[in-house]
């Protein structure tokens, strides 16, 4: 039997965020016939990733995170360490999803003269640096200046990002959402009162493809 593909997600109390997880599991299952697919939460839920891993003889954890913050560096690695050799983890999916962010941004309507990339933020500088690199690539794709604003744990904040873009002469701003699923963070974005806000990535073909390709790379014998 194929190794179980465990999609590692943050965890949420937001109804739409939970629905996203169910939809993502279904989409990945459809893209990888014959592969058992499960969700493993790293926070908030009663059963966390390290416990989920224990239920399977072999598993591949694919961290569905846009940056390698604490949960990727600590929780995922801890789940692997506690698995007794039954689980491995792949790199997180974030680096492959800039075009998905751009797609959602363009779907939000005509772009203004600049973009605010709204990101959750991390206590890990390396994770925030990944977000800044994403902003640079997004700017190249949409041919607009992109300023980054963090919602939690880091600076510049969303408000500071807007202020800086305004100071640079950009007043018609569109928000790109650096997140996979809806969550409580949306209230912080709405508080900006900007004209257009892009949806989070959601069930995007690039996300599904990134998850499946990482699983296949970790199980080459089964893919052959």
Task: State where each predicted segment sits.
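Active-site-proximal alpha-helix that buttresses catalytic centers in soluble enzyme cores
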Residues: 1-224
